[in-house]
Amino acid sequence: KEHNPITLTPHQIEKFVMAWYNRQAITYFNERAEPYAHKLGVPLPPIKLSRAKTRWGSCSSTGTISLNRALMFIKPELVRYLMTHELCHTMHMNHSLRYWQLVECYQPDYKSFEKRLHQASLQVPYWARSQ
């Protein structure tokens, strides 16, 4: 029996690869967030992907956490810190003193992580940046 090869355009290949990448990212982020949500005593919030150019993550007033897809390329300890940072926003929707005290309870060296996170974009391949 003859098999005809599947022919895809570059655009179709890109869509297929990006859909796969997005599924991997959601799985990865949920797996990383779950233990920290449990530690904080909050339910695991919905996580969605972002293509933000200047933010690694954000937390909406409804508790949804948006994470930049490029986080897949930075060091795991920075991703873990960012999960703590965003999950703390489900309790304090600002960067008040109380918010930072909560972050510090779970990540005592958060200031060093903040600095490292600001430099982490250098670890992201060009093709994965804000596309």
Where are these regions (language model features)?
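Active-site-proximal or metal-binding-adjacent scaffold patches in catalytic folds
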Residues: 1-81, 90-131
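Walker B catalytic acidic pair
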Residues: 86
